[in-house]
């Protein structure tokens, strides 16, 4: 079995009213030799602000924070919520180059105790090695 790095940081947000406590430099220390790096960071704005430009070694970031604004439309091939004007990555899976982010819209609420069009979400990921050797990362 391969080893993976599960990296977690405290909140880091690009909007000034949210604190920037997450320290990726410390959290990724001693992970260079691990072939797969997964990051848990609450605020999806962390992805564009630091992960994409400065931490290319992080394969996937898992995030939340947006709640999908508790209002919007999600269909098989379409999703919209006013929150996308603040957070470009606000619900579901996004990719840029070899990196990915998954933003979970959460189960709870903020303010109004309900949701319209954005259902509560619990996500389960199953990690498996690829059978295709060209997709397997080299350490």
Model-derived regions, located:
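Soluble catalytic domains of enzymes that build or remodel membrane lipids, polysaccharides, and related
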Residues: 1-139
């Amino acid at each position: 079995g391969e080893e993976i790095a599960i990296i977690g940081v405290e909140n880091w947000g690009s909007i000034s009213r949210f604190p920037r406590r997450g320290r990726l430099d410390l959290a990724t220390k001693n992970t260079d030799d691990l072939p797969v790096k997964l990051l848990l960071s609450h605020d999806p704005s962390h992805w564009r602000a630091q992960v994409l430009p400065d931490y290319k070694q992080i394969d996937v970031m898992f995030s939340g924070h947006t709640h999908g604004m508790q209002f919007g439309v999600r269909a098989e091939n379409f999703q919209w919520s006013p929150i996308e004007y603040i957070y470009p990555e606000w619900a579901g899976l996004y990719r840029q180059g070899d990196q990915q982010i998954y933003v979970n819209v959460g189960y709870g609420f903020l303010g109004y105790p309900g949701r319209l069009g954005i259902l509560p979400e619990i996500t389960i990921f199953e990690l498996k090695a690829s059978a295709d050797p060209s997709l397997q990362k080299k350490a």
